[in-house]
Amino acid sequence: MIRNRLLAILIAVGGTVGGTAAVSTASASAAGLTGAGSTLVAPLMTNWINGFEIKEGIPVKYSAVGSGEGIKAISKGTVDFGASDAPMTPEQEAACSGCVTIPWALSATGLGFNVPGLKKINLSGPVIAGIYFGKITNWNDPKIAKLNPKAKLPNLAITPIYRSDGSGDTYAFTNYLSKISPAWKSEVGYATTVGFKAGVGAKGNAGVTSTVAKTQGAIGYISASYLIAAGSLGVAAVENKAGNFEFPNLKNIEEAASTVKSLPASNTVSITNPPKKATGAYPISTFTYAIVPHTAAQKGFLQQFLNYAITKGQVYGAALDFAPLPKVVVSAAKSAIASL
């Protein structure tokens, strides 16, 4: 039942949530709010919108177009809020002058794969980098076999799948690889869009999930909530700094965020590859953010919606693999919302 509901949500967020028009629609009137951006947060956004409309009677429409497009939309003033899983770059900050970044959800980027007969596998950062560099090309590669001594690994070519659109999942994934692999950091780097050395591009989380599902031997980085819905895919346990292989589940995501003791003025913080003391942390965990103008035209409605998302709206997260925000993050978010 839960999986069917999630699949329905993911079909909806392939385009829009709440019946929204295209991103070019003018900013919301007094009738409600419009937003655009992250596909990672979109399943949770569906529940936020439904709950908020019931509680406050204020409609919210959201376009799940990817973090990069969401930042463009809020910078142009065509929506009331953007949503991104990546901090804005200096260039984006200049284009979105006066915009405020507010952390409002916590999840992870998982690795889903399609290998017949295999549902779980251990992968390390260097091996993942090797796959996306195009240097590890078969599932029976000795480097994969060493991490999975009991697994029956087939002679099957690996097809890495990546996001073709500007994506916060790409940011989290490549940020993690840049911390693990000096070669990745120098040759590819991390951003919402990078020049991958191997693989096939697909648009959105739904596109990556679909491409992996229909391609034997494929592997792709996918938001954790989409991995829940795509029950047919195998899921990788990724090695963390403590040397443990962990899955992108609530407990492990929450442990990754437990290392955050304060937030900088930007309200953004990376929790990929967290310190060794977080022994059970999933190492590609990430915060996701609302991006709003400091002088919002819909200030009152926007503050209500944002406060709802970071407090009462958090209860919807568990079923979708979103962990609750740490208290220190909620406090920083409330201060940022009050400053609008």
Model-derived features: where do they sit?
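Short, low-complexity disordered leader/linker segments with a strong preference
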Residues: M1-G32
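Flexible loop/hinge segments at secondary-structure junctions
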Residues: A22, S27-L340
